[in-house]
Regions:
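Short, surface-exposed connector motifs at secondary-structure boundaries
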Residues: 49-52, 118, 220-227
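Short, polar loop motifs at secondary-structure junctions
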Residues: 60-65, 233-237
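Acyltransferase donor/substrate-recognition loop-hinge adjacent to the catalytic core
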Residues: 74-145
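Conserved donor-binding loop and adjoining core beta-sheet/short helix segment
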Residues: 1-64, 175-204, 250
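Short catalytic-loop micro-motif centered on adjacent basic/acidic residues
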Residues: 55-57, 122, 227-231
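Glycine/small-residue-rich hydrophobic helix-like segments
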Residues: 161-227
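Short, conserved active-site entrance elements at the starts or edges of catalytic domains
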Residues: 127-179
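Active-site/acyl-donor-binding loops of N-acyltransferases
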Residues: 77-98, 223-261
């Protein structure tokens, strides 16, 4: 289950991992946009030479790829499993004070939370790893009950085990003496001033914890001087929450499976 890069002679590549019976592609191939679907086709034809491989999953790939793959005569592309929209927030326009009537409910929830709880933010290395793993486990348990699609917790556990290697920041939210969530992210490669909020995980132990974690992350990113925030992909429910902060939808992605005809 260790992710690997598959590379072509022209330096195109894709990030994948596999089990005994399936492969999974994570996000778009690193290639020219017009070559992305072709790279997935080539990879699919190669892995299906192994008769033990029954399915190839394409996870969160650009919405332009699916229609192109549907034309392949040797591969059967199944219906889209789910689609995500990816909002980007202009941090210059974001005001941490959350002024105006639009943010009244958020301000009230924030004020109530900090009146009722003692909270602090600490670096990840100040908290035992087993406690961070426990946050992820509880997040997964709740998430599986709330949504139909699969919940992938591997990347969170791996990040913890590897001391958040590659992340610019990883901060743990401690409430009333207990670690209850964490935020982590890094700068977007080749995009100066742009930050990716990759991880925001909580254990659902306190009312409004998700909101408060979001506000902590937004404040940190704002204070660090970043111009843009990639808020990460979401479906309708999570997207509705993010749109309160007036981001722009920059792209859409699909997740679907491919089998050999």
């Amino acid at each position: 289950d260790v992710p690997i890069f598959v590379q072509w002679t022209d330096d195109s590549s894709i990030l994948v991992h596999h089990s005994k019976s399936e492969w999974r592609i994570w996000s778009d191939p690193v290639s020219k946009e017009e070559d992305m679907a072709e790279r997935i086709e080539e990879f699919g034809m190669e892995v299906f030479k192994n008769k033990d491989i029954k399915v190839l999953w394409c996870g969160d790939v650009s919405e332009t790829i699916y229609p192109k793959l549907k034309n392949n005569k040797l591969l059967k592309v199944n219906d889209i499993y789910y689609s995500l929209s990816w909002p980007v927030l202009d941090m210059f326009k974001y005001d941490s004070l959350l002024p105006g009537g639009h943010f009244k409910d958020i301000r009230n929830a924030k004020s109530k939370f900090y009146r009722e709880h003692k909270a602090e933010v600490v670096n990840f290395d100040k908290v035992e790893k087993k406690l961070l793993h426990a946050i992820v486990d509880e997040w997964k348990n709740v998430a599986l009950k709330k949504q139909k699609e699969d919940v992938y917790d591997l990347k969170y556990h791996k990040a913890i085990d590897n001391d958040f290697k590659g992340f610019l920041t990883a901060r743990v939210f401690v409430v009333d003496g207990n670690p209850v969530g964490f935020n982590a992210g890094y700068e977007v490669v080749n995009s100066p001033g742009r930050f990716a909020g990759i991880m925001g995980i909580q254990d659902y132990s306190i009312n409004e914890l998700s909101l408060i974690l979001w506000l902590e992350d937004l404040d940190w990113i704002k204070n660090a001087g970043y111009e843009k925030l990639d808020m990460q992909g979401d479906e309708e429910g999570g997207l509705k929450f993010k749109m309160q902060f007036h981001p722009v939808i920059e792209r859409k992605t699909d997740t679907f499976s491919i089998i050999k005809k």
